[in-house]
Amino acid sequence: KKVKFMFLWCEYSHKMLLKCYNSHSFISTLARGRARIMVDYGINFWSNNDFIIADGKVKVNHKHKPALIDIVQEARERGYKGPLLLRFPHLIKNQVDKVFKAFEGAIKEYSYKGKFKAVFPLKVNQMPNFVLSLVEQSKDKCYGLEAGSKSELILAMAYTNENAPITVNGFKDKEMISLGFSAANMGHDITLTIEGLNELETIIEVAKELGEPYPNIGLRIRLHSTGMGIWAKSGGINSKFGLTSTELLEAINMLEKEQLLHKFT
């Protein structure tokens, strides 16, 4: 029975393999007088034409189009061993350009009077070889960094391009808020986004101690409406993040009273 089962399984696997070979997931080529069948790794679904298959190799579709296997072999010849993580700075620029092109098109289409600014959240990737490439590739764009901790804020202050925004989210104690005032004093376009009225009270306290220049002040609000998908439960009136409508009005009154309303953004 075991032999019969294995035979049936092998026959089934063989049929499935032939089916795959005849599908669009494989490319057939003739080389050295015999047929070769090469898997295309689903490249049409994920590469966005940034990677291509040519001469039987996966290649980077940029400039002289180096093959990934050639890059790995060269790394091995230099004495490096796996695993290797390859980064392609030109892809960063492509993605940044796509984002700005989309928003610039929408701004023009709907005659929007404002400007589009963007920030990259450092919590996603703080690796120097990525952050430095991102900053370098977005010099001509108003593309800054978002910080959620003191260490990330120091990193943003050190590497954000001139006139690019810095956004501070997450928990902020007095020390971090003071650091935000220091960033404003250095000339950074920085916004402290408050999560609760207690943070706004601390900002007002630090403003009285340090004086101008002040950072911009943002308010995270708690919307009544909810979205869809896996984050649906984290939104709406029951969300633990942001100010309620009542707290929003109170925050505006506090800013107006302390003559800081002009920094509200």
Language-model segments: residues:
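Residue-level detector of intrinsically disordered terminal segments
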Residues: 5, 15, 36-37
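Intrinsic-disorder-associated, low-complexity terminal segments enriched in Asp/Asn/His/Tyr and depleted
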Residues: 12-14, 21-24
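Low-complexity, highly charged intrinsically disordered N-terminal segments
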Residues: 54-64, 69-126
